[in-house]
């Protein structure tokens, strides 16, 4: 569901915000870490009975997009994408992308379910990274741009946005700050996710806000009629790394 029109601001205000963002993006902001991870083993034999080339393409596209937005981006897959490594890096992440299997997983110790996703680790038996694990490491610190390219992790009961310090609200950057969470509902096929994400990254590269980029990505057709995505955060933000610093005290 798109609600883009209700979040748009006057062109003059958007132009000021964009000029500020462009001024502070790029190499000068290289200290803002992002992690991009993709589960390739879980989409290849012997883990499944087919070979899927999209996880590698999706990782490359995401890493390029985050780098373009000013993040110091590390990419991890197969044996380098492990639960332990993800939780080590999340402490310092300002941006995070993952493509893998996701669900509302049962936690045996807590006897309840949490949103989460699976590591790669170069094997077919893949540990779950629960939202509670990420929340414990981040301790409430907000993340800038989070894209969870999995099944089920943008449904109403998802606990992942809060783990990354992003409220499940739709607002503007002056209200929520520079943060945006994107995910998919139900059983999402990576062929549809790939189409959506290409449109999303291209729109950001064309200097659309994250909310506008989401709306653009939703346009057109997908291979499965029930494909759906959702977001929470600041519609009017442009995705650049780091904290929001207004140009002056009266700009917002």
Map each language-model feature to its residues.
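Active-site-proximal C-terminal subdomain of hydrolase catalytic domains
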Residues: 145, 150-252
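Bacterial N-terminal signal peptides that target proteins for export
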Residues: 3-15
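A domain-level signal for caspase-like cysteine endopeptidase catalytic cores
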Residues: 30-121, 148
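Sec/Tat-exported extracytoplasmic proteins
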Residues: 66, 70, 97-100, 138, ...
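C-terminal region of N-terminal signal peptides and the immediate post-cleavage residues
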Residues: 22-31
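Bacterial N-terminal signal peptides
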Residues: 14-23
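Caspase-like (clan CD) cysteine peptidase catalytic core
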Residues: 120-150
